[in-house]
Regions:
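Pol beta-like nucleotidyltransferase catalytic core
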Residues: 1-234, 239-248, 254-403
Length: 403
């Protein structure tokens, strides 16, 4: 089992075995992104050790610029001191841009493996999670859409597509017409046009569809004004158990990056088949961690579609095909999928799953520190402050080392 609350203490303890007097910055409370939310772990060093900035709870966006600028100004105003950005995305266009701008080192891991392993560990014992072979299907799909503004305004387009295809009545759909953080969809949906180069005609058509829907669309929390954050729990378990397909609407969608959160693990814990609305190629990213998906039952080429609207529409096509199937056929399909559902469930709950990512994190941190070592005020590497033998370190770690 893993305890996410001591995650940064574990990282700091490991860093002290790699380099002398490391400094580690993390953000608290969970999900914070501002410099004022930084918490520090450090030794009484001489100011030459690398600074590791743990910006791994949230995706890297343009709005991170000010936070990173303040980190740079405080710890390396002259650019002499190494700063390493521990993050949770790969193949990221925006990350590469900011690494170059601030001259930060890169270190990545899949943070939400650790978070989800902690948050969802108790669901192994939840009697409400029914074996897939014994479920009675009443709804064809389920989807949760709490934050619907800013970069997640694509969820408004998705719900509009569901309604356009007469699919809402066939599923359990949760959608914030008034986003808890960004206000009413009538404002945020217009921002899609300029921010993401989506045609005005299409966006306005989606708004017209949304205007015709009777809100609220809720699965649970029907008596609250706003849908509360449920990242750390499985919400609406009875409704999940009577739904065939889980439509995961991820945090990142428009960007070019590999980035997933705890959301992708919810159907895995619940042993539900799923489709993924996220960045292009993120289903492939998930499979790289050993999970199986559902290309034996439907076309998963949607994952490769670069155009965001076409990707939404391809997923809606899968939902529509499923909605055309009778419940008894879906129950039989679920039984036929059970080996995949059990495989994913067992992988997630295996000790090896978290251990493998922890090993990856240690390797990535070691590589980053070797590439961005302690430096003197003039910028000269101080290699005797490294506690690892460069002679026994893989060659790819040694890029950037000069004496």
């Amino acid at each position: 089992m893993y305890n996410i609350h001591s995650h940064y203490e574990h990282i700091f303890s490991f860093l002290k075995t790699v380099v002398k007097d490391p400094v580690l910055l993390s953000f608290y409370p969970f999900g914070s992104t501002k410099f004022e939310n930084v918490e520090y772990m450090h030794c009484n060093g001489d100011g030459t050790s690398p600074v590791i900035v743990c910006y791994d709870q949230e995706p890297i966006l343009d709005s991170c610029v000010e936070t990173f600028r303040q980190v740079k100004q405080m710890y390396s105003p002259g650019g002499d001191r190494s700063i390493i950005l521990l993050n949770t995305e790969t193949n990221s266009k925006i990350k590469n841009k900011l690494l170059e701008e601030f001259k930060f080192g890169d270190c990545s891991c899949f943070f939400h493996i650790f978070a989800a392993a902690d948050w969802y560990r108790g669901y192994q014992h939840c009697v409400e999670l029914i074996d897939p072979s014994k479920r009675k299907i009443k709804k064809k799909y389920i989807t949760f859409n709490r934050i619907t503004g800013n970069s997640r305004a694509y969820r408004s387009l998705f719900v509009a597509e569901l309604d356009k295809n007469n699919l809402i009545e066939h599923g359990h759909v949760s959608y914030s017409d008034t986003c808890p953080e960004h206000g009413h969809y009538s404002t945020s949906i217009h921002e899609i046009i300029e921010k993401h180069n989506v045609s005005t005609e299409y966006v306005l058509a989606c708004k017209t569809i949304l205007d015709s829907i009777t809100f609220p669309l809720r699965i649970d929390f029907k008596d609250t004004a706003l849908i509360p954050n449920g990242s750390q729990t499985l919400n609406a378990i009875p409704e999940m158990m009577e739904s065939f397909l889980h439509v995961v609407t991820e945090t990142c969608f428009w960007e070019t990056k590999d980035h997933l959160t705890e959301k992708i693990f919810k159907p895995i814990v619940a042993r539900q088949p799923f489709v993924l609305l996220g960045c292009a190629n993120n289903l492939k990213y998930l499979k790289n961690y050993g999970f199986k998906t559902f290309d034996s039952w439907w076309d998963e080429s949607y994952d490769k579609i670069q155009d965001p609207v076409e990707r939404i529409q391809a997923v809606v096509k899968i939902i529509k095909d499923i909605c055309a199937m009778p419940e008894d056929e879906l129950e039989a399909t679920l039984r036929g999928m059970q080996y995949v559902l059990n495989y994913n469930y067992n992988l997630f709950y295996s000790k090896e799953f978290v251990q493998r990512e922890w090993n990856n994190l240690k390797q990535s941190l070691t590589q980053a520190v070797v590439q961005h070592p302690p430096r003197s005020p003039g910028g000269t590497p101080i290699l005797d402050h490294l506690y690892i033998s460069l002679d026994n370190t893989p060659a790819e770690y040694q890029t950037g080392i000069s004496v």
